[in-house]
């Protein structure tokens, strides 16, 4: 996306959040707190990990506080800290600026605005489509289980809706979902996920070869 003339498309399976309005279960632009849903009468913990039946094994708060116990200042080596290390601007202390307070979950919307302009792929696609659409047309292929363990399908839904609305040119790509498939579903509707996720290259290389 940042080098549209140098790469011949993407084949993304279970992509990390590609629309930050659904950063797993958090909208980093509109939500105030990453750990709880707002409500008039109660606060409800945001789920962070589930199985294909929707059984929740961890909340966003629990996952983040585990990271905090492993290392402060984005140094745990775990998933939320990894995203923060990539997306965030450098703070005055030399470490990535937190997208939210690890202890309370309060979101820093100034950091969110930086993420949006630099790493929110769905937003950048829409923003730059008039300039780069001809390079991106027909080259975007996204596959995701509709029961992704980390709710990554939520961002794919939003990105798909945006892509379908593009014109001049139309995006002419592929977005496909695996029914009840968990993390790392890659587009194969014929085999169980635990098999197909091990042969991803055998699936996407023939499709890629058609483009080149």
How would you name each of these model-derived features?
Residues 1-212:
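Non-catalytic cap/lid and distal C-terminal segments of serine-dependent acyl enzymes
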